[in-house]
Amino acid sequence: MAITAQMVKELREKTGAGMMDCKKALTETNGDMEKAIDWLREKGIAKAAKKADRIAAEGMTYIATEGNAAVILEVNSETDFVAKNEAFQTLVKELAAHLLKQKPATLDEALGQTMSSGSTVQDYINEAVAKIGEKITLRRFAVVNKADDETFGAYLHMGGRIGVLTLLAGSATEEVAKDVAMHIAALHPKYVSRDEVPQEEIAREREVLKQQALNEGKPENIVEKMVEGRLKKFYEDVCLLEQAFVKNPDVTVRQYVESSGATVKQFIRYEVGEGLEKRQDNFAEEVMSQVRKQ
């Protein structure tokens, strides 16, 4: 398979590895992006790719709760200037109120619904675009319902750059639920517990860690023990309950929550622009600098 400059650029953005290393990784894996990431990790050249790395899109996240329902949403704009605009922030809050009341199941359903003003959600956004002069998009949202004995936690970081909604069961207070949300904003876990990690992801991580150990020249008879030890670190990276609690690193999140008589049922973490447009380095200049060295 022909390795294109665009493929090399994408792999660089995902891993932070050098251009020539990325080209070699893609060549060795016949252009398979995921296998190329693993190849770089096995060689110790790159860490695991972060999906939210190098975000450039603007906008804000917002959370609203009422009774036993909560909504978290992300609305994008083209510039940070507009995201801080009072009219934009009012629009976000009005969209949140509508979503919380109507509880649409999908984004398409939400955009087609009629608001209290008589306009559809899409028309309401279009009217704001005409006034503000910039493209505005309702990117995503989630409506969460809880039982009477459950507690929501809401945390907005940097004016909504990151938004986290948690749902705790048991005797948790809103303060505990918010503390957990704050931790999630900072540490970015992917799952609540080990039970949620897909077996395919564990198998892939195990294989990468095994190859890392073998490439380090470790004897095969101790490789498995090393893999198990490093898997523990993997779980600490991706599982909320395994992580050292950000406000008291002497205890894990599991210990902190259980000491309050609670359990974590669910969390949703939105970061503005994650997975969208990425920072553009001057790729042409880097290519030229590499060519000159040859």
Curated annotation (Swiss-Prot):
Chain segments carrying region Involved in Mg(2+) ion dislocation from EF-Tu: 79-82
InterPro entries, per database record: EF-Ts_dimer_sf, Transl_elong_EFTs/EF1B, Transl_elong_EFTs/EF1B_dimer, Transl_elong_Ts_CS, UBA-like_sf
Alphabetic keyword roster: Cytoplasm, Elongation factor, Protein biosynthesis
CDD domains: UBA_EF-Ts
GO cellular component, one term: cytoplasm
Pfam short name (any one): EF-Ts_N
PROSITE patterns attached to this UniProt entry: EF_TS_1, EF_TS_2
Location in the cell: Cytoplasm
Main localization, broad class: cytoplasm
GO-annotated molecular function: translation elongation factor activity
Listed HAMAP family: EF_Ts (MF_00050)
PANTHER family with a match to the protein in the record: ELONGATION FACTOR TS, ELONGATION FACTOR TS, MITOCHONDRIAL
Similarity annotation: Belongs to the EF-Ts family.
Function: Associates with the EF-Tu.GDP complex and induces the exchange of GDP to GTP. It remains bound to the aminoacyl-tRNA.EF-Tu.GTP complex up to the GTP hydrolysis stage on the ribosome.
Name of this chain's protein: Elongation factor Ts
Organism name: Geobacillus thermodenitrificans (strain NG80-2)
